[in-house]
Amino acid sequence: MAKENSSHSLAEAKRKRLTWILCVSGLCILSYVLGSWQTNTVPTSSSEAYSRMGCDETSTTTRAQTTQTQTNPSSDDTSSSLSSSEPVELDFESHHKLELKITNQTVKYFEPCDMSLSEYTPCEDRERGRRFDRNMMKYRERHCPSKDELLYCLIPPPPNYKIPFKWPQSRDYAWYDNIPHKELSIEKAIQNWIQVEGERFRFPGGGTMFPRGADAYIDDIARLIPLTDGAIRTAIDTGCGVASFGAYLLKRDIVAMSFAPRDTHEAQVQFALERGVPAIIGIMGSRRLPYPARAFDLAHCSRCLIPWFQNDGLYLTEVDRVLRPGGYWILSGPPINWKKYWKGWERSQEDLKQEQDSIEDAARSLCWKKVTEKGDLSIWQKPINHVECNKLKRVHKTPPLCSKSDLPDFAWYKDLESCVTPLPEANSSDEFAGGALEDWPNRAFAVPPRIIGGTIPDINAEKFREDNEVWKERISYYKQIMPELSRGRFRNIMDMNAYLGGFAAAMMKYPSWVMNVVPVDAEKQTLGVIFERGFIGTYQDWCEGFSTYPRTYDLIHAGGLFSIYENRCDVTLILLEMDRILRPEGTVVFRDTVEMLTKIQSITNGMRWKSRILDHERGPFNPEKILLAVKSYWTGPSS
C-alpha cells in the first residue's frame, strides 16, 4: 500500500513540473512576438526618428550641414584634402539634446596680429637682439620671447599674397607681393643675385663669387672634386645669400642646408624658401650649429664674411665637427686669390696674405689636407679617421682634442669650444671612422652606421627596415586623403618629429624636400641617423619658435609630437607657431590619440583652419587617429 502511494506522488510531481515549464515557455514566446511586432514599426521620416530618440532634428541637421561645409571648402586643393569621397570622417562629438554649459570647450577665435608683424620671427627679433652682446655675433643668435612677450594672434600674410610658383619654376621666380622687398635687387644688382620683372622676382643664379652663374661655378668645383657619383649628398652653405648655390646643387642630387642670419631688410633666407630651396635662419656665432657631428659631406663658404681666422680658428673647428670623415670644405672669396682681387676688396696685400696664412694654419691644426687651390676656389679635405691625427696632437696640442665626456652630437644652445671633436675609433688608417656610407641614392635605405654600431638605444637593423615599410604604407594612404600630394602641390615640407627619417625617405619620388626636425625632448636622438641616410634636418625645442620666416612651408607633419609636449608648454603656442610657418592653403597632418586630436581641433577651429579626423591607415581599431587640417587663405589689410 505504501508503495502505491509513493508512485502516485512521484507522477503528480512530474506533471506539475511539466505544466510549469510549458507556462514559462509560452510566456517567453508571447514576449518575443510582442517585441518583434513593436520593433518592426520603423519610423517613416527623420522627424519621427529624432522624436523617438529624444533628439532635436534642427540642431542635428545644422551640424550635418556644418560638417559638409567644413569638408568642402572653396579652394580646389583644399577640397581635395578635406573631401569625404575616400576615408570616412570620424565624429567624436556627443549628439545629445541636453546642452552642457562647459565654458572651456568654447571655441576661441584668434585675431590677426598687426601688419607690422607680417615677417615676424619670434626668436630672431631685431629689437630683442639689441639687448645682447655684439661679441661673436651673439645679438644675432636665437633669443626667444619671454612669457610676457608671447603673441596669441595670427601672423598676417601681406595684402595680395599669392600661392608660390610650383617647382621647378619657383627656382627662378617668386611673387613680389609675397616678399615686397626690392632692396636686395638694388644692392646686389651688379652681382646678378635677383631682379625685379613686373610683379615677379627673377633669380638669374648669379652670386658674388660666381658672375657666370651658380651652375658654371658648380661645374668648376666638379672639375676638382667628384660631385656626381653619389659620394657627396649633404652640404652646408654658410652665409648662403638667396641660396642659388643650394638651388643648383639639387639638379646634381645634392641637398644643401643653406643658412644666413635674419637680415635688416634683405630677407635672404625668406627668398630661398620662397624659391623652394632648403634654408634656415642661422649664424656662426658663439654656439654650435644645430646639427649633429659628422652630418655633412661638404661645407661651402662663398664670401660668407665669417672670420675663419679669428679666435684660434674656432669657427673652422665647428665646421670640422659637422663635417663627415673625408668631407670637403670649399672656400671662395677673400682671401682666396687675393693677388688678383686685393684692390677691389679694398684691403692691403699684407692683410689678405696674413688672413690666408692663418686659415691654412687652422686647417692644418685640424689635420685637414689641402686638395687644391685653383682660380677663385680653395678646397680642403677632412681625414677619414684620426689615426694619424692622434699622433700629431701629441706634439701639436693646439687646439686639443675634446674630452671624451663631451657629447659631439649635442648642439642645442651649446657654446663653442676650442677643441677638435674626436672621430670614432678606427682600426686602420684606411678605415672610415664611424662607418662608411653607401653612395646616393642607395644611402637612403641602407642601414645607417649609427644603427649598425648600436649607438641608438633599442634601434636595430630590423626595426629600421620595419619603419621604412610602415612609411611606404602611410604615404600610400596619404595619397588617398591628400590627392594633391601626387600633383606636386607640396614643395617645402616639415616633419616636426622625424624619428628615423622614414617620412622623408618615402617622399623621395615627389618633387619636394623635407626639413627633418628632431625635438630636443625626444626619447631617442636620431638626427645623426637622418643625416647618414642623406637627408637634412635640425634640432628644435617646440616650446620655442622655429628659425624660419612666416609662410615658408606647404605641408607640415606632426606625428606624436603633442604627446611629447602637452605637459611641457602650452599646446596653443605650438599650434600658433605652426600657423606662422604654414603657407595659406597649406596642409597639416597630425597623428595622435583621439583625446589629443580633439583638443588640437578645438584650438585650430579658432585659427581659420578646416579639419577632419580620420581613421588610422590600418583601420578603425588602431587607437592612433589622423587629423587632416588645411589653413584657409586670407591676407592682411592694405595700408
UniProtKB/Swiss-Prot annotation:
Localisation per UniProt entry: Endoplasmic reticulum membrane
One Gene Ontology biological process: methylation
GO MF term set: methyltransferase activity
Compositionally biased tracts (Low complexity): 58-85
Record carries keyword GTP-binding: no
Any one GO CC term of the record: endoplasmic reticulum membrane
Membrane topology qualifier: Single-pass type II membrane protein
Cytoplasmic membrane side: 1-19
The entry's keywords: Endoplasmic reticulum, Glycoprotein, Membrane, Methyltransferase, Signal-anchor, Transferase, Transmembrane, Transmembrane helix
InterPro entries: Put_SAM_MeTrfase, SAM-dependent_MTases_sf
Pfam family, one: Methyltransf_29
Annotated stretches, region: Disordered: 41-86
Keyword Endoplasmic reticulum: yes
List of glycosylated residues: N104, N427
Domain of life of the source: Eukaryota
EC numbers: 2.1.1.-
TM segment ranges: 20-42
Sequence ranges on the Lumenal membrane side: 43-639
Family (UniProt): Belongs to the methyltransferase superfamily.
Protein name: Probable methyltransferase PMT18
